[in-house]
């Protein structure tokens, strides 16, 4: 997800998106630990998406 798309969302939507991404990250980590994750690049992708959402939330908090 791009930062420009995230900036168009409300704070409530961003918080929901953040919770969803954190749940997805948890599930991917569990799958990796049990050896069921073949696409390890997804962990990095989700991590970067979480960082993008947090950045936009901080930008909105500063306004």
Swiss-Prot record:
<keyword id="KW-0689">Ribosomal protein</keyword>
<protein>
    <recommendedName>
        <fullName>Large ribosomal subunit protein uL29</fullName>
    </recommendedName>
</protein>
<dbReference type="GO" id="GO:0003735">
    <property type="term" value="F:structural constituent of ribosome"/>
</dbReference>
<dbReference type="GO" id="GO:0006412">
    <property type="term" value="P:translation"/>
</dbReference>
<comment type="similarity">
    <text>Belongs to the universal ribosomal protein uL29 family.</text>
</comment>
<dbReference type="GO" id="GO:0022625">
    <property type="term" value="C:cytosolic large ribosomal subunit"/>
</dbReference>
<dbReference type="InterPro" id="IPR050063">
    <property type="entry name" value="Ribosomal_protein_uL29"/>
</dbReference>
<dbReference type="Pfam" id="PF00831">
    <property type="entry name" value="Ribosomal_L29"/>
</dbReference>
<dbReference type="InterPro" id="IPR018254">
    <property type="entry name" value="Ribosomal_uL29_CS"/>
</dbReference>
<keyword id="KW-0687">Ribonucleoprotein</keyword>
<dbReference type="InterPro" id="IPR036049">
    <property type="entry name" value="Ribosomal_uL29_sf"/>
</dbReference>
<dbReference type="InterPro" id="IPR001854">
    <property type="entry name" value="Ribosomal_uL29"/>
</dbReference>
């Amino acid at each position: 997800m791009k930062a420009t798309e995230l900036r168009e969302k409300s704070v409530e939507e961003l918080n929901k998106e953040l919770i969803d991404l954190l749940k997805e990250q948890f599930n991917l980590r569990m799958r990796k630990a049990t050896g069921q994750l073949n696409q390890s690049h997804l962990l990095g992708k989700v991590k970067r998406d979480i960082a993008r959402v947090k950045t936009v939330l901080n930008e909105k908090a500063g306004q």
